[in-house]
Regions:
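Conserved AdoMet/S-adenosylmethionine-binding subsite of the radical SAM
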Residues: 2-168
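C-terminal accessory regions of radical SAM enzymes
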Residues: 166-184
Length: 184
């Protein structure tokens, strides 16, 4: 709690990330209750938060807090697959892609700033399709590549990067190309 108060007093503007190392919305209600309490404490101290989850509907329980603080809240989800069989194999504990997309749309409609993390890219065509499926209710895209997998060598990352930039630019979307993909 002391750290939170110090951050609040310092005028910190960068968002506190929930979470890039473990999902804040898991299948355990105790964790989800802790996540909600953490959000409440951070918002009570006027600290900006950015949520990244694969939790889908599980995350919607906190949309009331986020929508009450639209200037302090960002909600994002990781999207990798349009193919549900691949999604279930690679992301077995994550919510289905369609569910995550519905949660994104709901957040956006509540006035919450939304973003998508498109990574790792297993199939460039699926990633491009995900942009086309979500662009009407996503404010920002972060795009990375597949790393630490032999499959990465079979993808022409330069072509993919250029296609992503073209599509997002044509749609008028803000985006960030991660360093691992920028070099192509």
């Amino acid at each position: 709690m002391d750290t939170i108060k110090k951050l609040a007093k310092s005028g910190e503007k960068r968002p506190i990330l929930l979470s890039f190392t473990t999902d804040p919305y898991q299948h355990f209600d105790e964790i989800n209750q802790l996540t909600r309490r953490a959000i409440e404490i951070l918002l009570e101290n006027n600290l900006k938060i950015s949520i990244l989850t694969k939790g889908g509907r599980r995350s919607e329980r906190d949309f009331d807090l986020l929508s009450d603080h639209p200037n302090l809240s960002e909600y994002g989800t990781t999207l990798v697959f349009t193919n549900e069989k691949m999604r279930a194999q690679i992301e077995p504990n994550a919510a289905p892609t369609k569910e995550r997309i519905k949660s994104l749309k709901k957040a956006y409609n509540l006035g919450i700033y939304t973003y998508v993390s498109l990574e790792p890219v297993w199939n460039p065509l699926e990633s491009l399709a995900l942009i086309k499926m979500t662009h009407k209710f996503v404010n920002f895209y972060k795009v990375g590549k597949l790393n630490y997998n032999d499959r990465q060598n079979s993808i022409n990352w330069k072509i993919f990067k250029n296609e992503v930039i073209t599509i997002l630019s044509e749609l008028g979307k803000d985006y960030y190309i991660k360093k691992d993909l920028q070099k192509y």
